[in-house]
From Swiss-Prot:
May participate in maintenance of mesenchymal cell lineages derived from both mesoderm and the neural crest and in patterning of the limbs and the face. This is Paired mesoderm homeobox protein 1. Interacts with MAF and MAFB. It is found in: Nucleus. One of its GO terms (molecular function) is HMG box domain binding. Keywords: Developmental protein, DNA-binding, Homeobox, Nucleus. GO terms for biological process: artery morphogenesis; cartilage development; embryonic cranial skeleton morphogenesis; embryonic limb morphogenesis; inner ear morphogenesis; mesenchymal cell proliferation; middle ear morphogenesis; neuron fate determination. Residues 69-84 have a biased composition (Polar residues).
């Protein structure tokens, strides 16, 4: 105990001597300066971190929601719908914006359309300056005018084809009327002959020719009657000629 107490007293006696010396003061001041500057640096860094924590970490997740790139799921469909509605409104406004042409403008446009249906850019620009319109309006007018011209041409061709078909069908029905032939009269002498006559085959053939004209039927009947008369005369002459033994 006595030795330890004596050692402590010696250290206390030596401490003032170290502090009073110039080297000891310089070392202590250097340590003090270094530690203060280091603490200031740490305090400044800590203040910056604390400020960032107060700004960003006060409400967790708020910065993510408030960032422009990230939005909540409930807001996204509503924004898309608003954007679509605005685009539809713009389209409707563009469609409703139509140009009304006066009589002088229409006359000038029609006069150029009679010359050419497809004017080039130089012609359109010159015409637009003359009628006090934009080149885009003139181009749209020519597009609509060409479409109207094509519709009128198709309507005219359809009406012409319908009239031609109607006239052709009338001519065909007038030509293709059926003609009913008259039945040929039967001769009276044909009924007087029997079936055993040698010319009965010719008589049966005459009955099949019912579709012939009346004049042809009469000529055929006369020729058959003449043949029958000749046959009778021949048979009578044969019976009268005596036979030679």
């Amino acid at each position: 105990m006595a030795s330890s107490y004596a050692h402590a007293m010696e250290r206390q006696a030596l401490l003032p001597a170290r502090l009073d010396g110039p080297a000891g003061l310089d070392n202590l001041q250097a340590k003090k300066n270094f530690s203060v500057s280091h603490l200031l640096d740490l305090e400044e860094a800590g203040d910056m971190v604390a400020a960032q924590g107060d700004e960003g970490g006060g409400e967790p997740g708020r910065s993510l929601l408030e960032s422009p790139g990230l939005t909540s799921g409930s807001d996204t469909p509503q924004q898309d719908n608003d954007q679509l509605n605005s685009e539809e409104k713009k389209k409707r406004k563009q469609r409703r914006n139509r140009t009304t042409f006066n009589s002088s403008q229409l006359q000038a446009l029609e006069r150029v359309f009679e010359r050419t249906h497809y004017p080039d850019a130089f012609v359109r620009e010159d015409l637009a300056r003359r009628v006090n319109l934009t080149e885009a309006r003139v181009q749209v007018w020519f597009q609509n005018r060409r479409a109207k011209f094509r519709r009128n041409e198709r309507a005219m061709l359809a009406s012409k084809n319908a009239s031609l078909l109607k006239s052709y069908s009338g001519d065909v029905t007038a030509v293709e009327q059926p003609i009913v032939p008259r039945p040929a009269p039967r001769p009276t002498d044909y009924l007087s002959w029997g079936t055993a006559s040698p010319y009965s085959a010719m008589a049966t053939y005459s009955t099949t020719c019912t579709n012939a004209s009346p004049a042809q039927g009469m000529n055929m009947a006369n020729s058959i009657a003449n043949l029958r008369l000749k046959a009778k005369e021949y048979s009578l002459q044969r019976n009268q000629v005596p036979t030679v033994n």
